């Protein structure tokens, strides 16, 4: 805290000016650091408790409150006494009491105030001599003279030297005054020395004429009003000086008691507040000085106007007093400026210190975080591309952290500069500067150490990559040499030269010594990398061994005797397959760049072609298997390389773009349209990255030594590939956002930092490209693994990947549906989608009416779900990319629980019928090709069959519960038909095997025809579910009702004889089963139990039972087709004539 200071302004004894009192201990206090001497008038002294208790606000050197002219201005204006400025012979001040008739009426208080004020004006030295009173009573009476003199003598507050009285001039009053004065002389002597004067000339004997005013016969120029104005101005100025001193004292105390703040904001606020107050104090000083100069100027003008003898001593004293006050103000201002300069310097140094400390805390936090982050960078890379990516990350991290390092170094230099400028907090600044330099050096050293390790790792991986490429080229060379051409001496010599020439390149490309590699790269070798180096070395050694064997073999062939020898093809023998070892987790050794795969496709395709020719020539199974194994390894190598490259590219996008969107240092580059849109732009790319990096890539590496089994890896993780569907569904939104913001400086800056040649949108397309790439690689692998152990897994994996691609493609169409009020997710899985030509045929009431509102078909896009089929209208969109994709306006939907199909429509192999609610609504659908129609019919049949199975199982379960809890209804039931149908239904459910697909679409058992004229009840010939079973009953009753209406309601329904086409092979069954194949034509003989029909093959004449579900199309006189509904019955509508 600053030392406390105060200003004391008082009047110097013996003068009418102001000064600071001298105390015994003043000399000691002036020796303190903050003692500032102003003058002998105003002094800045150190405050103490004793000094604070003293009265410091006195302006007059008296014990009472001093009077000012302004306070008794009205009393002074009465002019019953005035101080003209005249002096006696010894310098005594002269106070004149002019003739004032109402002198006796003046109140004592007024008289006392005027006397006190007049006697306080001269200096203490002049007042000490004593005052001379001139009482003019020439026009008064003696009684008044006596009373006046006695009153004056009794109330005069100062020393009296002489009282001169001009007695009355009337004869009577003069005679009376002489007599009275003689008799009362003793009274006057006891109180004041009084001299009675008869005339003015007598007065001149005591006081010189130059010291008397004109009314007393003198020459002294005196104007009472002018004197009163001068006194008021001088005293006003003196009061201003006093108030200024008090203000400076208060301000100095405030500055001294102010504690230094601990933060930048508070220090700045204190400095600004003190500066404003200092400016105000300086303004008050300026106004006081201006006022003093104005008063001094007026006094000097008055002196210049008058003659030299007319200038009295009081005027000179007034002028000197004003000059002294002005000098005091100037000295006070200088002392205050000096004090303020020290205070301001300390506040500014405090502010500099707070800025330094704040910057130190910020930079230290950044450097500590950077040091912690660099400490986590322990990965040295598992491939060349990975190391290059790590080096780019390190360079980017160093660039970002370099700003903080430069700031720390600059801050350290600022601290050194503060120390050089003699800052008061040197002991606090110097350690912080040293710590900043230490942090910067430590961080730079860690960056350099990390860069050195990665450079070593890069060098090692480049050597390994070179060795791997050399091995691959050697394998390509061996695979591309035709064995049949090597049988001749010339061919063997040519092949031998190729091998020897290739082996000569090994000195530059292969790893010479394994221990030397371990020793040279000891600082970076971990367990995984050592294993990787070992396997590369083993691969190199194995390849060299194969080359040496081939070389020895070729040398023998080249050295043979040239004589005709009948070539004999070796007998093909099955190669003993060694069991594939349990795959162990290892790091991939191949380069992760996607270009590698592209460069290798040409050689191994050429090798495959030449080996195919070679196999035709020699027919060697062993050579063929070896060649296929090489090709499988190439496909596996390409799969791993492209997978690693894919993972690296995803990581690059996530760290170089997605993470930077949350970086505060890059926020100013983001456009407003990108705020909070990271999930829209990148979708679930992070989820895809974590799946491939943590799971799929590592599992793929386990199959490096047995690539033919890689299909198992795909099958085990097939459900995880569903994440691509979410990404593809978000792709239109992502691409739309990219088109809006592709020119954003943020993307350009990120691309520059990553050193990418392609923009972000190319990398956002990578997941879509990758999911389509798998099926191509699986096809290649399957092509070279037909007779291997994992061929079935490869085939299943390929089918599953194609199914995922189809699901992704279908979902892209599904999200384009507009106008559907419900939730598409409630409709179940999307099975198929496609565009068709559709005609409608409706039936209303009990009469069937064809409503062909259009002669031209409607173009509709159908979406087949598990629970409904949707009809939509396709609308083409204008735009680019995904915005050009069509949208689909929803028109109507059909619940699959009430849908039936007619597989063939007469006259067109591409048409089929979808009918609804017992053919109340019929939709004739024409597919683009017969194949598409067959696929849709088959898929719809699967849906209806699965619904029927679920219905039958539920019905059997309920029937079983009812049979255990309720007795069978009595024959005397009020509804015999209904009761009979329930019993028959229960028997049917017991007979039907729920696991047999032959019973899914069977008709009711018909052991004998029903009685003529009674007809069939709706429940006696169908496997309908109870009424509470999800709508199956209502759907079936509508179908049967439709059948009855179309038959006209006449008598019982009979089986229509005719021919049927077999649509599914049937080779299994009992001794009475008829073996048929798809496409055979059979004739219906009898409908039996459990969904079996008894038919005859007209070609062979054989008869037997076949499942009714295998018979689809009836070829008879009616020309109508068999239909399948969700109720599961084979519905045979009546032929119309």
UniProtKB/Swiss-Prot annotation:
Domain of life from the UniProt record: Eukaryota
Provide the alphabetized UniProt keywords.
Cell membrane, Coiled coil, Cytoplasm, Guanine-nucleotide releasing factor, Lipid-binding, Membrane, Phosphoprotein, Proto-oncogene, SH3 domain
Question: What does the UniProt entry say about where the protein is found?
Answer: Cytoplasm; Cell membrane
Q: Which residues carry this modification: Phosphoserine?
A: 457, 480, 620, 1033-1034, 1041-1042
* Basic and acidic residues bias (residue ranges): 607-616
User: Polar residues bias: where?
Assistant: 1119-1128
What range(s) does the SH3 domain occupy?
1055-1116
SUPFAM superfamilies given in the database record = CRAL/TRIO domain, DBL homology domain (DH-domain), PH domain-like, SH3-domain, Spectrin repeat
* Entry's Gene Ontology molecular function annotations: guanyl-nucleotide exchange factor activity; phosphatidylinositol binding
CDD domains hit by this protein = PH_Dbs, RhoGEF, SEC14, SH3_DBS, SPEC
InterPro entries listed in its UniProt record = CRAL-TRIO_dom, CRAL-TRIO_dom_sf, DBL_dom_sf, DBS_PH, DBS_SH3, DH_dom, GDS_CDC24_CS, PH-like_dom_sf
- Residues forming the PH domain are 829-945
Spectrin repeat start-end pairs: 351-456
List the residue ranges of the region (Disordered). 557-625, 955-1058, 1116-1137
Q: How does it sit in the membrane?
A: Peripheral membrane protein
Where's the CRAL-TRIO domain? 52-224
What are the GO BP annotations of this UniProt entry? intracellular signal transduction; positive regulation of Rho protein signal transduction; regulation of small GTPase mediated signal transduction
Q: Which GO terms describe its cellular component?
A: cytoplasm; cytosol; endomembrane system; extracellular space; extrinsic component of cytoplasmic side of plasma membrane; plasma membrane
Primary localization class, coarse = cytoplasm
Coiled-coil intervals, chain numbering: 503-529
Residue ranges of every copy of the DH domain listed in the record: 631-811
Query: What does the UniProt record say this protein does?
Result: Guanine nucleotide exchange factor that catalyzes guanine nucleotide exchange on RHOA and CDC42, and thereby contributes to the regulation of RHOA and CDC42 signaling pathways. Seems to lack activity with RAC1. Becomes activated and highly tumorigenic by truncation of the N-terminus. Isoform 5 activates CDC42.
Task: Give the family from UniProt.
Answer: Belongs to the MCF2 family.
Domain notes for this protein: The CRAL-TRIO domain mediates interaction with various inositol phospholipids, such as phosphatidylinositol 3-phosphate (PI3P), phosphatidylinositol 4-phosphate (PI4P) and phosphatidylinositol 5-phosphate (PI5P).
Q: Subunit composition?
A: Interacts with GTP-bound RAC1. Interacts with CDC42. Interacts with RHOA. Interacts with CCPG1, which results in specific inhibition of its exchange activity toward RHOA, but does not affect its activity on CDC42.
Q: What is this protein called?
A: Guanine nucleotide exchange factor DBS
Gene this protein is translated from: MCF2L
């Amino acid at each position: 805290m600053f030392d406390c200071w105060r200003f004391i302004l008082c009047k110097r004894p013996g003068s009418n000016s102001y000064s600071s009192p001298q105390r015994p201990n003043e000399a000691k206090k002036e020796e303190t650091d903050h003692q500032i001497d102003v003058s002998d008038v105003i002094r800045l002294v150190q405050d103490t408790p004793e000094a604070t208790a003293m009265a410091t606000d006195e302006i007059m050197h008296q014990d009472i409150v001093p009077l000012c002219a302004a306070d008794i201005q009205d009393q002074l204006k009465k002019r019953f006494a005035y101080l003209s400025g005249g002096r006696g012979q010894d310098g005594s001040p002269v106070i004149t009491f002019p003739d004032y008739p109402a002198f006796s009426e003046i109140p004592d208080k007024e008289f006392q105030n005027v006397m006190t004020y007049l006697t306080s004006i001269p200096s203490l030295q002049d007042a000490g001599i004593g005052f001379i009173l001139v009482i003019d009573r020439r026009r008064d009476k003696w009684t008044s003279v006596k009373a006046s003199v006695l009153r004056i003598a009794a109330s005069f507050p100062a020393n009296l030297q002489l009282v001169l009285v001009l007695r009355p001039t009337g004869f009577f009053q003069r005679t009376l005054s002489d007599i009275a004065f003689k008799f009362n002389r003793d009274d006057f002597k006891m109180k004041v020395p009084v001299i009675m004067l008869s005339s003015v000339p007598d007065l001149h004997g005591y006081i010189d004429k130059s010291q008397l005013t004109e009314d007393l016969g003198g020459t002294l120029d005196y104007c009472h009003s002018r004197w009163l104005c001068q006194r008021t101005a001088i005293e006003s100025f003196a009061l201003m000086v006093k108030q200024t001193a008090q203000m400076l004292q208060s301000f100095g105390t405030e500055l001294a008691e102010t504690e230094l703040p601990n933060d930048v904001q508070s220090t700045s606020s204190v400095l600004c507040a003190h500066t404003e107050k200092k400016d105000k104090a300086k303004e008050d000083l300026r106004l006081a000085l201006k006022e003093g100069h104005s008063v001094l100027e007026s006094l000097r003008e008055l002196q210049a106007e008058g003659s030299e003898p007319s200038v009295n001593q009081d005027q000179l004293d007034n002028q000197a007093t004003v000059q002294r006050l002005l000098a005091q103000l100037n000295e006070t201002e200088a002392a205050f400026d000096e004090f303020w300069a020290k205070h301001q310097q300390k506040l500014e140094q405090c502010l500099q210190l707070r800025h330094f400390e704040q910057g130190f805390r910020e930079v230290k936090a950044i450097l500590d975080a950077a040091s912690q982050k660099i400490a986590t960078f322990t990965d040295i890379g598992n491939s060349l591309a990975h190391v290059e990516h790590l080096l780019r990350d390190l360079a980017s991290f160093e660039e970002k952290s370099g700003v903080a390092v430069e700031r720390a170094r600059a801050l350290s230099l600022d601290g050194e500069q503060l120390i050089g400028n003699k800052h008061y907090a040197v002991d606090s600044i110097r350690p912080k500067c040293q710590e900043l330099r230490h942090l910067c050096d430590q961080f730079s050293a860690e960056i350099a150490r990390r860069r050195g390790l990665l450079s070593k790792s890069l060098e090692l991986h480049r050597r390994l990559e070179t060795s791997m490429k050399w091995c691959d080229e050697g394998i390509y060379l061996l695979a591309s040499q035709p064995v049949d051409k090597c049988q001749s001496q010339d061919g063997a010599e040519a092949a031998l030269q190729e091998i020897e020439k290739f082996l000569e390149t090994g000195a530059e490309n292969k790893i010479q010594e394994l221990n030397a590699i371990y020793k040279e790269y000891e600082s970076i070798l971990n367990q995984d990398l050592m294993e990787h180096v070992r396997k590369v070395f083993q691969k190199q050694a194995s390849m060299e061994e194969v080359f040496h064997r081939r070389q020895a073999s070729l040398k023998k062939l080249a050295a043979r005797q040239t004589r005709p020898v009948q070539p004999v093809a070796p007998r093909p023998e099955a190669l003993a397959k060694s069991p594939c070892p349990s795959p162990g987790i290892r790091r991939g050794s191949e380069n992760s760049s996607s270009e590698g795969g592209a460069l290798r496709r040409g050689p191994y395709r050429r090798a495959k072609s030449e080996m195919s020719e070679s196999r035709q020539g020699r027919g060697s199974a062993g050579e063929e298997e070896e060649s296929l194994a090489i090709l499988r390894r190439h496909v596996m190598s390409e799969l791993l390389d492209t997978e690693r490259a894919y993972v690296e590219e995803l990581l690059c996008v996530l760290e170089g773009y997605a993470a930077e969107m949350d970086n505060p240092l890059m926020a100013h580059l983001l456009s407003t349209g990108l705020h909070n849109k990271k999930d829209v732009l990148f979708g679930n790319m992070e989820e895809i990255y974590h799946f491939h990096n943590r799971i799929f890539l590592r599992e793929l590496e386990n199959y490096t030594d047995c690539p033919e089994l890689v299909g198992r890896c795909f099958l085990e993780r097939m459900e995880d590939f569903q994440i691509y569907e979410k990404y593809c569904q978000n792709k239109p939104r992502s691409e739309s956002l990219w088109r809006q913001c592709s020119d954003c400086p943020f993307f350009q800056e990120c691309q520059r930092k990553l050193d990418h040649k392609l923009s972000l949108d190319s990398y956002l397309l990578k997941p879509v490209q990758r999911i389509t790439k798998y099926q191509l690689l699986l096809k290649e692998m399957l092509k070279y693994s037909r007779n291997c152990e994992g061929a079935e897994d490869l085939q299943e994996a390929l089918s599953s990947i194609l199914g995922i691609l189809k699901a992704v493609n279908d979902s892209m169409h599904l999200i384009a549906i507009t106008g559907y009020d419900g939730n598409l997710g409630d409709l179940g899985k999307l099975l198929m989608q496609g565009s068709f030509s559709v005609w409608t045929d409706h039936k209303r009431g009990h009469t069937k009416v064809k409503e062909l509102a259009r002669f031209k078909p409607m173009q509709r896009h159908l979406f087949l779900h598990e629970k409904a089929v949707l009809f939509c209208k396709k609308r083409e969109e204008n735009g680019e990319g995904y915005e050009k994709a069509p949208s689909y306006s929803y028109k109507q939907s059909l619940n699959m629980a009430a849908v039936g199909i007619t597989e063939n429509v007469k006259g067109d192999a591409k048409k089929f019928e979808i009918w609804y609610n017992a053919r109340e609504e019929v939709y004739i659908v024409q597919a683009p090709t017969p194949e598409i129609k067959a696929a849709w019919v088959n898929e719809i049949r699967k849906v209806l069959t699965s619904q029927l199975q679920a219905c039958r199982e539920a019905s059997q379960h309920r029937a079983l519960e009812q049979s255990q809890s309720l007795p069978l209804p009595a024959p005397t039931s009020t509804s015999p038909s209904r009761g009979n149908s329930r019993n028959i239904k229960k028997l049917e459910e017991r007979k039907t095997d729920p696991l047999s697909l032959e019973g899914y679409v069977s008709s009711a058992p018909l052991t004998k025809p029903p009685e003529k004229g009674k007809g069939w009840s709706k429940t006696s010939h169908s496997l309908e579910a109870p009424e509470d079973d999800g709508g199956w009953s209502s759907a079936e009753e509508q179908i049967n009702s439709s059948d009855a209406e179309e038959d006209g309601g006449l008598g019982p329904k009979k089986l229509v004889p005719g021919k049927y086409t077999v649509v599914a092979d049937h080779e299994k069954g009992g001794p009475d089963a008829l073996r048929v194949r798809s496409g055979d034509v059979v004739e219906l003989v009898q409908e039996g139990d459990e969904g079996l029909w008894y038919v005859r093959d007209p070609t062979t004449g054989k008869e037997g039972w076949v499942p009714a579900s295998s018979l689809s199309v009836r070829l008879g006189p009616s020309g109508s087709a068999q239909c399948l509904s969700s109720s599961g019955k084979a519905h045979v509508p009546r032929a119309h004539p």
